[in-house]
UniProtKB/Swiss-Prot annotation:
Alphabetical list of PROSITE patterns matching this protein: PORPHOBILINOGEN_DEAM
Pfam families: Porphobil_deam, Porphobil_deamC
Keyword annotations: Porphyrin biosynthesis, Transferase
Pathway field: Porphyrin-containing compound metabolism; protoporphyrin-IX biosynthesis; coproporphyrinogen-III from 5-aminolevulinate: step 2/4
Similarity field: Belongs to the HMBS family.
Listed cofactors: dipyrromethane
Protein name: Porphobilinogen deaminase
GO BP, one annotated term: protoporphyrinogen IX biosynthetic process
């Protein structure tokens, strides 16, 4: 059995927190194992003056980490699952899906306690087309502007007065112990989360079963089921990370309750679908919900988004 395991991770404070968390969990479960971190920047980290949807390409936050693994410099990579492409490069696989943290989006403002309190014409910041579509649908009177950078950078722009409010992932703020910045969490009814939001995944080389044996102890089966359903819906819609697609799976007894949506960027049209299915076949349920959305015209909305990017 390996004595040392090397984790490729992004350099941002949140990514480092996630890698440190996985390191601690692995060392707790495997006595004598030493876990090392290899921090690096990715394409998505370096290009901060262009909306993510316009940069294009899959693996904006994952490719450089995979390159380190290919070069033999790292054994695994820790990812926020919402950044992981629907299809991984050949030879790579997800060896563990960790227990999901809060999947919601958080409303953050220095002047307003609630999203509904924002005055007409208020400037709302988000980097997500999914959030933009849903929040514009709820409040077409707002001005939604792009917001890039890590969590600290985004909060700094809010504090500098560039925005009246911003929306960030609840899980990221809580992991960085910035709970006090959250004015309230947006319900899934207001803003359906991104695929696998709040979930961490560990990527490894399929040809290395020894590594899989070490990491699969962290796999959380209930979260894995939810992740499979959400990613199957997203994959059928041919959605990447930067698309106006929301999806949220919940477990109810032996069933999965899956909600999905596709939204026009200006919020003028929001298509919704939901269904229940067996936990034994989450991917079939995901594809079914996607097909329902496509029947409503989701393909045309997404084509417009890709054409604008």
């Amino acid at each position: 059995m390996k004595k040392t395991l090397r984790i490729a991770t992004r350099k941002s404070p949140l990514a480092m927190w996630q890698a440190e968390f996985v390191k601690a969990e692995l060392e707790k479960h495997h006595e004598g194992l030493t876990v090392e971190l290899l921090p690096m920047s990715t394409k998505g980290d370096k290009i901060l003056d262009v909306p993510l949807a316009k940069i294009g390409g899959k693996g904006l936050f994952t490719k450089e980490l995979e390159d380190r693994m290919l070069a033999g410099e790292a054994d695994i990579a820790v990812h926020s699952m919402k950044d992981v492409p629907m299809v991984l490069p050949e030879g790579f696989a997800l060896g563990a899906i960790l227990e999901r943290h809060e999947p919601t989006d958080a409303f953050v403002s220095n002047d307003y306690a609630h999203f509904e309190e924002l005055p007409q014409g208020a400037v709302l910041g988000t980097s997500s087309l999914r959030r933009k579509a849903q929040l514009m649908a709820a409040r077409p009177d707002l001005v939604v502007k792009d917001l890039r950078g890590n969590v600290g950078t985004r909060l700094g722009k809010l504090d500098a007065g560039d925005y009246d409010a911003i929306v960030l992932a609840t899980s990221g703020l809580k992991r960085l112990e910035l709970d006090e910045r959250i004015r309230h969490e947006l319900s899934p009814e207001t803003c359906l989360p991104a695929v696998s939001q709040g979930t961490l995944g560990i990527e490894y080389f399929e040809k290395d079963p020894e590594v899989l044996e070490l990491i699969q102890v962290l796999n959380h089966r209930d979260t894995e089921i939810r992740t499979l359903a959400e990613r199957a819906m997203n994959h059928r819609l041919e959605g990447g990370c930067q698309v106006p697609i929301g999806v949220y799976a919940e477990l109810e007894d032996d069933q999965i309750y899956l909600r999905g949506l596709v939204g026009a960027l200006d919020g003028s049209e929001i298509l919704r679908s939901e269904a229940r299915g067996s936990q034994k076949d989450p991917e079939t349920l995901g594809v079914y919900v996607a097909e329902q959305l496509l029947e409503q015209g989701a393909g045309e909305i997404l084509k417009e988004v890709y054409d604008q990017a």
